[in-house]
Amino acid sequence: GVRTILVDGKGFHLNGKLIKFQGVCLHHDLGPLGAAVNRAALIRQIRILKDMGCDAIRTAHNMPSTMQMEVCDSMGMMVMAESFDMWLYPKCKNGYALHFRDWAERDMTNLVLCHRNHPCIVMWSIGNEIPEQWSVQGRQLSRWLQDICHRLDPTRPVTQGMDKAEASLQSGFAQVM
């Protein structure tokens, strides 16, 4: 049905109701199945999460599968779809930082275009504990990625996982969100 999303000083509202997420960060693997996508395993995973009181997941640092979003749609699980674990500053030697300049806009665009019609998606995340969160460059990149999301989907908020609160506030990085 029709839904509305609002974020204000009180928090996150879905269809006019204030929501306090009971969520988890969920990596894309299915335990011993690895990264293979299996509908029955996804249904089992979401059912277990719901049985323990979970109503939301944050996809951890990768574009989620369409099948996972379909299962979340059908089971009423809210999703924050997250794109990146790093931007320009590497967290490891062979990570996404090597490809960020060439691929970030396409990857962010693909995430939003692929999943924006899924009712389970309640917000977009442009990064997880990004090292640039303490810098002016990070603030600029954050604004750029947020603008991509809002251009393609003006109906949902954009956020990111920050682990250095004081530095994020001092650099203006946190205020972009």
Predicted regions and their residues:
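Active-site-adjacent substrate/metal-binding segments within catalytic domains
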Residues: 1-143, 158-159
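Extracellular glycoside hydrolase catalytic/binding regions
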Residues: 140-177
